[in-house]
Amino acid sequence: MSKPLDYLKETPSQTAGPYVHIGMTPNEYDIGGVIPEDLGLRVVSDGVKGERIKVTGRVIDGGGNPVGDCVVEIWQADANGIYNSPMEHRSGVDPNFSGWGRQPAGSSGEFSFDTIKPGQVPLASGGFMAPHITFWIVARGINVG
């Protein structure tokens, strides 16, 4: 019979304070003078290579209600499958593509990103990852369990 491990407890959730989304997108909340433009507002600039796409969505809670008090970030490779990252060892990153974006969701929980269709990222095994966009959602009250 297996015995439960009492020393592997759930890590307590931690908050980043009441200003997470406000601090990440101060201009959206009329807090001027911090930075000229909120970081991550633009994923692409003129001259970007690849097929332009618009990614839209809506963040809802378990009851189907909109979560308007949140921030959505995306991370992705460029059209050639190259990440704009110091960890990227391949050359040829598109200088007109940031590789990430950040948008606050409106009161309806909706968000939208103008980006490009990501390319396949090569794996060490010789295969490829499917083109994908990674989403990170930050909101008050997100807990484990």
Task: Give each language-model segment a name.
Residues 1-145:
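Beta-strand-dominated extracellular/periplasmic modules and repeats
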